């Protein structure tokens, strides 16, 4: 039977009504053109079923419903008697998505944006959405000043109704700012105002912040900077009237004109506080005091609002509202500030939760909390918990989130979200210098053993001059009050002459135990006991060694000697760094010392002081200045000298970079008859034949030391934002000296420097790169000594794993 077909609808739903009001009864529904979409799925999306009586409106609704599924780019509905024939053309399926020519936008970011718009491999292609994406990407390029950019979507058909989608980018070049004009300024010059902008029409070579490339977002920030500049100086009526951005015909240049009205300067006449102050009116009034005749300052007003919110937050009012309304009196040029405060409800903490701590146990994090469950919410206590977690050094990032409990008017949960870092490290170091050659060191350290917070270290060194092993364990919470307990045992076989030090061998072993007592949030006192056995041999007589032996009642030509010492160890630590892992703000001071106690063969004391201060110079803490110092002093007691093997040394990656480790400071002056190792090429003699002694390049250290360093940390070039918190670049200037306060110049040959002079300061400068790698912290440094003395040994390139600062 010839099929009688009637076209009743199309893509634009523009067909005429042909059935009349009564319509017809559908006895069957057939589809043509389905490939990927199942018949059942298509039927479910239709409002019409077999047996329904349909009219023109029902058919139009059917077409709309099928289009709404997003699976079809064309739909036609035909009638064959009482059968509906639905002809569809499915949208093609995306088989692959590729990008070409995109440099400013990474592939991953493009994929995320496409997926957010429903464009992904395996999904059907919506050409309308594709056009919107093209326009959106071009708008993005325009916003960053690339006005010649274009984005085209190239769709290549494939068999089985599939397509390849390729986005082709022509980014062009960024339009550069030719001139920035500010019209209407009288109190301040245009140059002064523009000097605070990120966008510039001229950028000196030394300015690493300014940028001539136009970006819409940066312009918005600069306009806000301009507004704040005037409001902070009393111009309460200041207004930006308009902003024009003009493009040159070749789309490579930008002219920016900002029209402003400065107005007059206004002074504050008073501050009136009203509203629900939750019983803290006296404290709030202290925060709103102003000096008589003080200029209106927008930043101070904002800070005052924030201070009031913080004050109320400390008492559990988590969501206070503080609004300041300036009342401007144009007659006498004054502003009265009306501050309305609504403290809101007082909130209590139901639970404290931790997220992201896959290795660290909850108890390790919970013991750092100062906010208690069941107590009212204290914003300062929550922040203290965040600071303490950061200072542990276990985490790359720590964030807090205060979540309201559903159905409760006054309860919240506090969530700490942490991102753990690798707290274990291989302490492996390599150094190379023109004189020293290659040197090695190794060890293993785990600062968060099995997630318990215990610090466990197994360190060992094996090279031509030393065999060293150490096991150390520290429990930071030996008691619930935070008293720590640490201990270690060690063995050391040290051939000093092979290490470019004075000639002797020391085999030592010992142990110590230390308790740490937290005084407050930032201060800790430590006290402990130690024991060490030193067995000296192969000692070649030299002046510093002779002084020590004589003070111990030994002959100057003694070649071997043993001593057992018991010490009282003490220390104090002040730590207010923002985090233990790559700090960017705050200070740390560490004082350590020890003194021998009765029962010891030696009688002496030693004190060391280390300080580090980080000062960020931008709001994002990406540019940081670091100042470090290290001081040390020791001396004998009861007429005895401090053992020469306890001397301080300087030089190397942790003190003065660019110098070989431990080589700065006094050198050995060997006595008559002293013999050196014939394989030792560092000395210019085999046997000393001068009665006054022979100088050498062998370092002996000193009983006093001073080291300082100034470091400028910058963002690391070519590093993505993902790794910005794991890599640190710095330029440094190191200086330091070691001296012997007991040195007598008259006891040495005339060609020997005065080693009691602290003014023999060494200096170096260079660049360093630190990377928190999966193996632990890696430190690369290159330094050039520019002030050194005879006998000093340079080591320009140094590389270490396991040391950061």
Swiss-Prot record:
Primary localization: membrane
GO annotation terms (biological process): Gram-negative-bacterium-type cell outer membrane assembly; protein insertion into membrane
Domain (POTRA) ranges: 24-91, 92-172, 175-263, 266-344, 347-421
Domain of life: Bacteria
Subcellular location: Cell outer membrane
Pfam families with a match to the protein in the record: Omp85, POTRA
Transmembrane segments annotated in the record for this chain: none
Keywords: Cell outer membrane, Membrane, Repeat, Signal, Transmembrane, Transmembrane beta strand
Gene Ontology cellular-component terms listed: Bam protein complex
Signal peptide interval: 1-20
Function in brief: Part of the outer membrane protein assembly complex, which is involved in assembly and insertion of beta-barrel proteins into the outer membrane. Constitutes, with BamD, the core component of the assembly machinery.
Family in the record: Belongs to the BamA family.
UniProt cross-references to PANTHER family, sorted A to Z: OUTER MEMBRANE PROTEIN ASSEMBLY FACTOR BAMA, SORTING AND ASSEMBLY MACHINERY SAMM50 PROTEIN FAMILY MEMBER
UniProt subunit comment: Part of the Bam complex, which is composed of the outer membrane protein BamA, and four lipoproteins BamB, BamC, BamD and BamE.
Protein name: Outer membrane protein assembly factor BamA
Organism, as annotated: Salmonella choleraesuis (strain SC-B67)
Gene name tied to this protein: bamA
